[in-house]
Amino acid sequence: LKPLHIFIHGGYWRALDKDYHAHMSVPFNKNNILFFNINYDLCPKVTLSDICNQTIEAIIWIFNNCKNYGGNNKKISISGHSAGAHLVSYLLNIDWSMYDLPKNVFQGAALISGIYNLKIVQKISVNKELNLSNKEVQEKTTLNKLPTFKIPLFISYGENEPEGWKHQSISYCDFLTKNDYKYKVIPSKGDNHFTLIDTLANENSNICKEIIKLSK
């Protein structure tokens, strides 16, 4: 059975689709790693809470069905970009034993230019579509929540991103450091928030190499 990697796309929870990121499967396939590229409904059709629940359902389905595709559910890694990185950080906070899954369902995770403090999102224009409630902001902000299990964790952001985007990742790293949670951070030289996607799909990039390493 092959190890498998799960990717969650970004788009501020309100845009894009897994098909925009299908090219990311190439380096994983070359390394004999199954690639699961998951989708979710978008705001304002659904709430952020709905999206979080959908990603939980996706993980449960993949865990229970990956063997049908030749996958090893004991070797699951996961990554996400932007809003997708937020969703991955949220999934790291779940007690998976509540769903009859191993508590440490992931063997490694990569957070690429994520959004971890939703209080900021609540104050900007995209919130017209997200319509985040105060309860959602409190429950779904991951900046102050430690992962429920310790795994290799890789955090990256683009060197040329706006300071606000960088600050999200740096603040999350600071929180992990204060709580003695080990991680590895690699800024991606020359990248902005959007070119990071192509870098993720480039098997010669540091980010892609690190994620492949997490996945084996």
Would you name each region that the model predicts?
Residues L1-K216:
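Alpha/beta-hydrolase superfamily serine-hydrolase fold, recognizing
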